[in-house]
C-alpha cells in the first residue's frame, strides 16, 4: 500500500504511486482470451510534433474516461496509442535544426510518450507503434502491390495543386485561399504522373454505409454525403467543329438538368482540355490565358469564389437537338479532373453560367418557368438580374422555348430526353459522383516509399512481396527543397524484378493519410506477420473513436474506404472500421496583443498577462506583468502558436497534478462543444480535489465504520443515502449513454456538498457516509484515477486496480421517498414485497417489482405479458 501524508493532498506523490502500481501490474495490457464483452476505444493517433497541447489532453482524456468506465462495467477494454510519424513538419524541422527527420521524430515520440504517461492514461503500451518504421509500413506497401494487380491502384497524369516551396502536390483541402496550407506559397497547377487508388469504385458503398452508422454525428455523415456527391443525370454528346467547319472529337457533358438543354448558349471546357490545347496552337492570346490559369487552384471551393475568367476558343459545338452551333469557351471554373472537363452552359438557369455570360456578352435564354409563381417577382424573368427561382428544381417547373418539350415538368423532360438520346446513341443515363479517386503520390522524402520500379522495357512493376519492405533511408543529408532519395543513385537505381534489366525506384512517397487509414486495425494485431491476423475480427469494428470534426472528409473518408479494401482482401470481416464516433470541440483561450511597429500584432501569452476587474468582477482591461503596461484583449480563439495563447499541459500538471487537469478538461464543457481554458476554473477543480481528500481522511480518522443497516436508518440518513444513489444513477447514465462528463462531475460535487453538511456521527450515520465516500471515489475514478486509487486504500479497501472493481449500481430501494409496502405477486401468488414512494410512477413500481429478488427468481425464463397494479396494495405480474 502506498503511503501519503494524512489530510494533505500531494498530487505528485499520489500520481507517482498509482502509476508505479499500474506499470508493475501491467494493469491495462489486454488480450483476446476473455469472456467479458470487448470494448475497443481509441483517439485519433497524434503526430509527434514534440509536445502535447491541450487539444491532445482533452481528446485523450475523453477516451480514457470511457475506457476506464467500460472496464468497471465488466468489459475487456483495448485502448492503444501510436504515432502518425511521417509528414512535412519533420522535414521542415530537419531543415531548421540541421538534423535528420527520423532523429527529430523519434526524440519527439519519446518526449510525448512520457507526457502521456504522466497524465495517467489507461493505455496498452505493448501495442504501441510509429508509422514511420518499416515493420509498420511494409504492410501498406504489400497491400498497394496487391491493389495494383487488381487494378485498384493505377498511375496517370493529373492536374494537381503544386506547392513550389514545399515541392509537393497538395490535396484540394490543403489549398487555403490559393496558397499552400503549410508554406503559404501561391499554388500552381501542374500535370504530373500520380498514383491513385480507385475510391470511386466504392463511392456508392461509402454513401450507403453512412445509413448504418447510427453512432456517428449527423454533421459528419452529411459532410461525407456531400463530398461523395451522388447525382443522377444524362451524359450528352455534342459534336465539335473547328474554325473551318471540320469535325473534331466530340464533347461529352454530364448534366443533372437535361430539362434546360434548350437553354444551352455555349459550352465551357477546362484550360487543360485537349480541345483547349488544340485551339491554343493557333491562338497566342488563348495560349497565354491557359498559362495564366495554371496558377489557379483546382479545388471547387476556390472556383466558387474566384473571379470568372475565360476566352472563346474559336471552336463550336453542335446542339444535339436544334443543330445550332454554339461557341466553345475556356472557363476557369471548369476542372479537368471533375467529370469530362466540359459543361453545357445554361446561363438562364445556372448562376455561374449567368455571371459568365453577362461578363462576356453571351446569349441568355429562359427555358423554364414556375407553374405556380408566388408573387409578381416570380413571374418576371430578367437576363440581367439573377433570381434564385431560375435554378430551383424543388419547385414545380414547366419547360418553355423548348420546341416539342414545351409544357413538360422536370421528370417528364428528363425521361423524354433520356429516351431520345439513348435511342439515337447521343447520350445515356448516368450516375455521377463528386468524389474523385484518391491521389496518393507525394513528392517528399519523409514518407512511405511507393513500392514500384520503373523499367524501360516492362513499365511500372510492383516490387515483389519477398523484396518488401522498400526501406526509406533514415540517415540522410537534408536540403531545403526536393527529396534526398531523388538524388541518391545508390537508393534509386535497381534492377527490374521482371526482366532483370536496369531500372529505377519510384521516388515519390505515399500521402500520409495512407498510414492513418488502417492503423486502427493494426493495434489489434501487434507484431502480426501480415497486416492483421485473426485477432482483428475480435476487436473490430472499434466501438468508440474520438477526434476532431475537421477530419470528417479526408481522414474519415479514406479510413472507411481502406477498411473496405481490407475487407475485400479478407483481412477483416466488418464493413466499417468504427461503430461510434465522438467529435470533440476545440480548446479555446483568451488572446492578448500589442500593436507591432510593422502594423501587425505581437501576441502575448495569457500566462504573462494580468486581468484587471472592477468591484463587480467585470473585466476592465489587462496589463503585461513584466512592465505593468496595458495590452489589448483580442477575444477567445482556438489555442494556437500563431496567437500565442496555448497553455502547456506539462506546466499545468506540474502545478496542479494530472487529476486536476483531467477533471477541469472534462468539467468545463460537454465533449462536443468548445472548451474555454480558464486557470481560475482549474484552481476550482484543485480546491474540490483537496476538499474530497480532506473529507475522506476526516471520516477515516474518526474510526472504522460499522456495517450499514438500511432498516435502522433515520429519515436524514435515508435522505443522504438517497442522494448517493441518485448520484450513482445519474453518473452512470452520463458516462455510459450520454458522454456528458461535465454533468457527471457536477453531480458528484453536489453529493460532496451534501455530505459536508451531514454531521451525523452515529454508527449508522458513519456507515451512510462510508457508502457515499466509496461511491464518490469510484464514480470519479474514470476521471481522477490517481486520487481514487489512493483514497480507495484510505477507505480501507486495499490497493487494487479500481478498473476491476464494479462500477456502483444504484439501489432502487434507496431512491424511495415516503415508502409504501406493496405485495408482489407472480400470476396471483405472493412472491415478495417492495417499498415504494407514495407518488412513485407506474414505471418505477413495475421495475421495482420485477427486481425484487424472490420475484426475479420466479420470473427467470418467463416473458412478462402484463402488470396489474392495485394502488397502495398489490403488484400482480402476469407472466408465461
From Swiss-Prot:
Short motif 'HIGH' region, span: 46-56
A GO cellular component annotation in the UniProt record: cytosol
Residues given in the record as ATP binding sites: 641
Keyword Transmembrane helix attributed: no
Major location (coarse): cytoplasm
Biological processes per GO annotation: leucyl-tRNA aminoacylation
Location in or out of the cell: Cytoplasm
Enzyme class: ligase
Motif ('KMSKS' region): 638-642
Pfam family, one: Anticodon_1
Keyword field contains Nucleotide-binding: yes
Keywords: Aminoacyl-tRNA synthetase, ATP-binding, Cytoplasm, Ligase, Nucleotide-binding, Protein biosynthesis
Origin superkingdom: Bacteria
Reactions it catalyzes: tRNA(Leu) + L-leucine + ATP = L-leucyl-tRNA(Leu) + AMP + diphosphate
MF terms (GO), sorted A to Z: aminoacyl-tRNA deacylase activity; ATP binding; leucine-tRNA ligase activity
EC numbers for this chain: 6.1.1.4
Family the UniProt entry places it in: Belongs to the class-I aminoacyl-tRNA synthetase family.
Protein's name according to its UniProt entry: Leucine--tRNA ligase
Source organism of this protein record: Xanthomonas oryzae pv. oryzae (strain KACC10331 / KXO85)
This protein's encoding gene: leuS
